[in-house]
């Protein structure tokens, strides 16, 4: 199976393969199997850099005038301690299966590292960092009056959710992962879990959207607003609310409201979560961008929504989305959760987090943004070590403040 997939991946990612497209390029057995193997631990360093050759996409157009970030000429080095052992930067990069690392401090790039064949033009999958992007778009739509209130019920914008698990839930509930919908987010895609069912039908076989599942099959488990339950389904429904409220494709709205005015350097793109004729942006986990543009996005949020001299995102929204009262998400889970941003205990720091250890880590106290793009064998579990590294970077800058 691995040999067959390697051969398929090579053919998919080669320039010659793009010249001979079949009549239905996204639903051939080869393409379906390619999407089915995207998390393969021996090849995810490659697939995570080439999602547009495995999935149907929608492009988010960049600015013609990029936001220039000065680059520090001095070499960057840092060490950190984890579980009683101290590691150098190079050891961290290898130990945590790093594809790319960017560190911005005081509006300047102080470290920019590419690995595993990637470069400044590579567009990396965000996985669930996309939730923080979708939240940002919701905030902009709210400021424009396209969404009247985040306390509006989901069914006001998506009447097809009447009678589903989302009836009675509000936009705020979805932003905070408290919809009350019965959903179990377990990343074992070879086992018959709820997430596997929706993932395989939406992202692999292209049979229906995440929002189709939400409307037709979701069920209520708890009262909305009462219990934190991390859910890519909630974030996907948020994206469907967004596109319905603004009356535009999500990619076009993002280009117009964020990617162009913020001075992003290169086009980004969303992978699609359904069949080609009706599929739309996979708002829960499907954005792709360059390392620097992820850094620009994090820097914009650090700046209170400001980018290259322009106020792109309302500052009040940024404060609400990333701050507030820190409340742990559960027993043994010290991180909190605001509007699709994770918060850090005893700190003003917050972060966007994606599967297989993708991070945009923002520390307001030291004016630092860290982007870490990975291809770890395990989908989750290494966050404590990453937080130890981020803490060491922040401590390094705190000494120079």
Give residue spans per PLM region.
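Structured C-terminal helix/loop/strand segments within mature extracytoplasmic catalytic/sensor domains
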Residues: 21-34, 352-401
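Active-site Gly/Thr loop motif
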Residues: 264-272, 318-369
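Active-site-proximal alpha-helical segments within enzyme catalytic domains
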Residues: 234-241, 285-306, 358-374
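Active-site SXXK
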Residues: 107, 125-150, 174, 238-242, ...
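Catalytic-site signature segments of enzymes, centered on catalytic residues
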Residues: 114, 120-121, 186-188, 196-275
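Active-site-proximal loop and beta-strand segments within enzyme catalytic domains
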Residues: 78-92, 108, 119-121, 141-227
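Active-site helix/loop module of the DD-peptidase/beta-lactamase fold
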Residues: 125, 144-186, 219, 244-284, ...
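N-terminal leader/targeting segments and the immediately adjacent pre-domain N-terminus
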Residues: 16-119, 147, 176, 180, ...
């Amino acid at each position: 199976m691995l040999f067959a997939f390697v051969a398929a991946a090579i053919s998919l990612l080669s320039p010659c393969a793009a010249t001979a497209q079949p009549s239905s390029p996204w639903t051939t057995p080869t393409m379906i199997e390619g999407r089915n193997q995207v998390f393969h631990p021996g090849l995810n360093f490659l697939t995570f850099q080439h999602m547009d050759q495995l999935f149907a996409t929608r492009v988010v157009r960049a600015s013609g005038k990029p936001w220039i970030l000065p680059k520090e000429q001095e070499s960057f080095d840092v060490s950190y301690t984890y579980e009683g052992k101290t590691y150098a930067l190079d050891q961290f990069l290898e130990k945590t299966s790093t594809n790319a690392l960017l560190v911005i401090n005081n509006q300047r790039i102080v470290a920019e590292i590419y690995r595993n064949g990637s470069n400044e033009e590579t567009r990396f999958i965000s996985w669930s960092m996309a939730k923080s992007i979708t939240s940002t778009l919701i905030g902009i739509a709210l400021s424009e009056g396209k969404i009247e209130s985040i306390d509006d019920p989901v069914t006001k914008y998506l009447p097809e959710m009447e009678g589903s698990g989302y009836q009675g839930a509000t936009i705020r509930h979805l932003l905070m992962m408290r919809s009350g919908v019965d959903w179990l987010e377990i990343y074992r895609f070879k086992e018959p879990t709820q997430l596997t069912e929706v993932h395989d039908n939406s992202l692999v076989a292209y049979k229906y959207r995440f929002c189709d599942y939400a409307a037709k099959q979701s069920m209520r488990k708890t009262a909305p607003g009462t219990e934190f339950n991390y859910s890519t389904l909630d974030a996907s429904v948020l994206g469907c609310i967004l596109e319905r409220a603004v009356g535009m494709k999500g990619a076009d709205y993002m280009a117009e409201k964020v990617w162009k005015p913020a001075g992003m350097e290169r086009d980004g793109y969303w992978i699609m979560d359904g069949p080609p004729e009706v599929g739309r942006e996979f708002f829960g986990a499907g954005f792709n961008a360059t390392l620097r543009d992820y850094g620009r996005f994090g820097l914009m949020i650090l700046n209170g929504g400001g980018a290259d001299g322009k106020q792109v995102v309302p500052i009040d929204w940024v404060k609400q989305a990333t701050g507030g009262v820190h409340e742990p998400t559960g027993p043994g889970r010290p991180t909190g959760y605001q509007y699709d941003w994770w918060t850090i205990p005893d700190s003003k720091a917050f972060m966007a987090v994606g599967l297989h250890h993708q991070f945009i880590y923002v520390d307001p106290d030291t004016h630092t943004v860290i982007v870490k793009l990975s291809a770890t064998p395990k989908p989750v579990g290494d966050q404590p070590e990453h937080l130890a590294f981020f803490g060491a970077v922040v401590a390094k800058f705190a000494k120079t403040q």
